């Protein structure tokens, strides 16, 4: 069996890994911890990236690994590239990872390679300096230079809103810096970059339809898996669902692939999965890059399995051990699939988490369904509302014979789970 190290495994990774364990094709090893779940996230207190990499290098040199995988944006993707380089295993160039993950530097590179696909942008240092004028006019959209899951992403209309948005208590500021610290320690060792990753990226506001382009590179050759539509909750910039296949015209999808190809070659992105988010503006027919992520979108890739009949994790693991992936699209039960995100936009008075028995009943009725729960309370709930503007309490992946069947199954499943928020029930209208 090939030996694969999984770094900072995510809940969606575990579904695919369990299936592969049963096949006895790979032997998996795990390192890292879950930033979102207690008590694992206590490890963040003591986490130091360079000693962590050195420890793994010593440990796995003796074991004889065949490959390393991570779909973890915050720490895992960069560590996987660095560790693969040290152990002589297949992996991406750490410089390409940094060029993707440092969102301001990434914009500078994008501007050189595909300027037509880049919105106006500017860097804002943190802490704010009210004596220095901004290089971008209000209103603008702001996001951290180094972050994930849309944390602290928001439209800002004036200086007061900016100050309020970036006002943190002692623990919040410590947590933010602690999450960025590993990247900040590695960046100057590999690059001459001086732009502090604790700062923020401000961008002109773009409206339009959002989509996600998935694919992978091997030896510099680019392969696309497909495009997924990103649908927002009405009147927000918050994901409501991800739907495959995309309903955008083929011509638009092909243009996105052309932009992605130029960008990936320009970044020297030669190995591993990627996902690139785009805005499409129907009025102007423009495509703009939102961001590029140097990893698989683990929440979304099993949508391809439902519709196209192959598991992208098979591709991911083959890449990790240096094999050429073979994608065999097969007959499948579904023509469409979606990842539905359940959210509250106001603090719930009372949360009723479905019992294990109720969840088992749902999965018995819908064996293709995958559902994850993220219930929070107390300070964690308060922080999620502050940092994300909403509270994500569950995610459901589901297939359908067609879109009508997809939303019918979704509605019936919601009834069984007692998820009856009107915003959820009206998904089919978006």
PLM features per residue range, with description:
Residues 49, 53-63, 85, 95-141, ...:
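N-terminal beta-alpha lobe that positions the nucleotide/phosphoryl donor
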Residues 117-119, 159-206, 238-239, 261-266:
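Conserved ATP-binding module of the ATP-grasp superfamily
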Residues 270-283, 427-430:
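A short glycine-rich, hydrophobically flanked beta-strand micro-motif that places a catalytic Asp/Glu
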Residues 1-96, 127-130, 322, 374-384, ...:
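ATP-binding N-terminal substructure of ATP-dependent carboxylate-amine bond-forming enzymes
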Residues 169, 354-359, 406-415:
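Short amphipathic alpha-helices in soluble, non-transmembrane regions
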Residues 154, 164-166, 200-204, 210-231, ...:
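Beta-strand scaffold of nucleotide-dependent catalytic cores
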Residues 345-377:
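Glycine-rich active-site loop/lid that clamps phosphate-bearing ligands
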Residues 255-276, 294-351:
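Active-site "cap" helix and flanking loop/linker of ATP-utilizing ligase/carboxylase catalytic domains
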């Amino acid at each position: 069996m090939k030996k694969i190290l999984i770094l900072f495994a995510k809940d969606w990774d575990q579904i695919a890994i369990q299936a592969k364990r049963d096949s006895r094709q790979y032997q998996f090893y795990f390192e890292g911890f879950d930033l979102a779940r207690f008590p694992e996230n206590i490890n963040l207190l003591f986490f130091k990236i360079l000693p962590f990499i050195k420890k793994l290098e010593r440990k796995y040199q003796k074991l004889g690994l065949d490959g390393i995988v991570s779909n973890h944006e915050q720490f895992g993707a960069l560590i996987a590239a660095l560790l693969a380089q040290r152990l002589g295993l297949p992996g991406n160039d750490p410089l390409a990872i940094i060029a993707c993950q440092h969102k301001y530097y990434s914009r500078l590179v994008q501007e050189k390679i595909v300027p037509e696909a880049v919105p106006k942008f500017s860097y804002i240092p943190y802490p704010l300096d009210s004596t220095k004028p901004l290089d971008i006019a209000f209103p603008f959209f702001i996001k951290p230079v180094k972050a994930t899951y849309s944390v602290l992403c928001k439209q800002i209309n004036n200086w007061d809103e900016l100050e309020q948005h970036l006002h943190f208590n002692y623990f919040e500021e410590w947590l933010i810096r602690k999450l960025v610290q590993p990247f900040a320690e590695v960046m100057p060792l590999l690059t001459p970059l001086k732009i502090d990753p604790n700062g923020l990226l401000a961008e002109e506001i773009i409206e339009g339809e959002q989509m996600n382009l998935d694919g992978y590179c091997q030896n510099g050759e680019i392969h696309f898996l497909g495009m997924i539509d990103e649908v927002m909750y009405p009147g927000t910039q918050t994901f409501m669902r991800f739907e495959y296949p995309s309903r955008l015209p083929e011509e638009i999808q092909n243009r996105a692939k052309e932009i992605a190809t130029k960008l990936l070659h320009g970044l020297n992105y030669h190995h591993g999965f990627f996902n690139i988010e785009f805005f499409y503006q129907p009025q102007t027919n423009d495509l703009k890059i939102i961001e590029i992520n140097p990893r698989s979108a683990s929440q979304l890739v099993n949508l391809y399995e439902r519709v196209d009949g192959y598991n992208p994790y098979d591709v991911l693991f083959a890449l990790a051990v240096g094999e050429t992936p073979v994608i065999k699209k097969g007959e499948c039960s579904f023509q469409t699939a979606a990842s539905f995100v359940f959210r509250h936009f106001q603090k719930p008075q009372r949360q009723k988490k479905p019992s294990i028995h109720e969840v088992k009943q749902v999965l018995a009725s819908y064996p293709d369904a995958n559902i994850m729960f993220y219930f929070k309370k107390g300070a964690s709930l308060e922080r999620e509302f502050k940092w994300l503007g909403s509270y994500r309490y569950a995610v459901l992946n589901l297939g359908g014979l067609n879109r009508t069947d997809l939303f019918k199954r979704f509605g019936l499943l919601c009834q069984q789970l007692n998820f009856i928020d009107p915003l959820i029930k009206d998904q089919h209208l978006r």
